[in-house]
Amino acid sequence: LLMLTFFIAEQGRAQTYHRTSQGIKSTVQGINIDISFFSPVTVRILKSPDGWKYTKESLSVIGQPEKVKLSVSSKGGILTIKSHQLTVHLNEETGQITFASSDGKSLLQEQNKGARFDDFNDAGTKTFSVYQSFTLEKDEAIYGLGQLQNGKMSQRNQTKRLIQDNLEDVIPFFQSVKGYGLFWDNYSPTIFKDNQEETSFLSEVGDCIDFYFLYGENADGVVDQMRYLTGQVPMFPLWTYGFWQSRERYKSQKEIVGVVQKYRELGVPLDGIIQDWRYWGSNYRGNAMDFGN
């Protein structure tokens, strides 16, 4: 009887998911979960409320999923999806996802019941504010979030609103000294928070939770996977790596040309000079100060 009960329970758990070409889909605690391997080391996680219909076309991801050899097994309420380089565990009772290397080293885990969907009215369209929390190690340094003006290297222990700004370019992405990266694929105003209790993303608008886990083993490997997802960044031409002259602004074309001439007169190499905001003028046409070339 005990053996039969165990068999039925295990069968019940097994029926909570089904295989897809890239991984599995499951519904746990009223949340649809889609775990899809884009490569042996890159996994996409999609979550949405059960019954919610939506279409998500990324504005950032251009990489196409590779055909990845996977093994899927279920034991003790834990569903395990493995490539030859990365292991993903799904708790079939709580929906918690954890990521580990192929040799079993823990990399990152979601918090238990760490996904949340709050109703949001987006200019008359029903959608959600979406939230996902993770647990990082106490002394785990992370880098990224874009080009910020906060003077920090590691982006731990802060709350940061990620929105494009005149002085800051934000990217909802970080990479860890443990050799993985996390890309939160959402373009609405987003709160990144890290404290002793959690590391989380909260986006104002989203039909789903959508993020990518990238395991590169080191920083270069993570960047390589991010390029695979979002495209190569072209190198600047050689001359841009030389000496540049910059100041708050120049008042006229005569002034800026005079500075260049003085550099030439002194024999000081100059590869670029920056004319900042004064050229804008009082309307959209720009070129307000006779930069006539």
Identify the role of each PLM range.
Residues 1-16:
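Bacterial Sec-dependent N-terminal signal peptides
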Residues 15-29:
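Short N-terminal segments immediately surrounding and downstream of signal-peptide cleavage
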Residues 16, 32-34, 71, 87-89, ...:
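Short, surface-exposed charged micro-motifs
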Residues 17, 21, 36-79, 116-120:
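A low-complexity, Ser/Thr/Gly/Pro-enriched, surface-exposed linker/loop concept
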Residues 57-84, 151, 159, 284-293:
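Aromatic/His-enriched, Gly/Pro-containing loop or helix-boundary segments
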Residues 74-238, 247-248, 253, 258-267:
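Catalytic and substrate-binding clefts that recognize carbohydrates or anionic sugar/phosphate headgroups
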Residues 240-242, 272:
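Structural preference for beta-strand elements that scaffold enzyme active sites
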Residues 269-293:
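Aromatic- and carboxylate-enriched substrate-binding clefts and catalytic-loop regions
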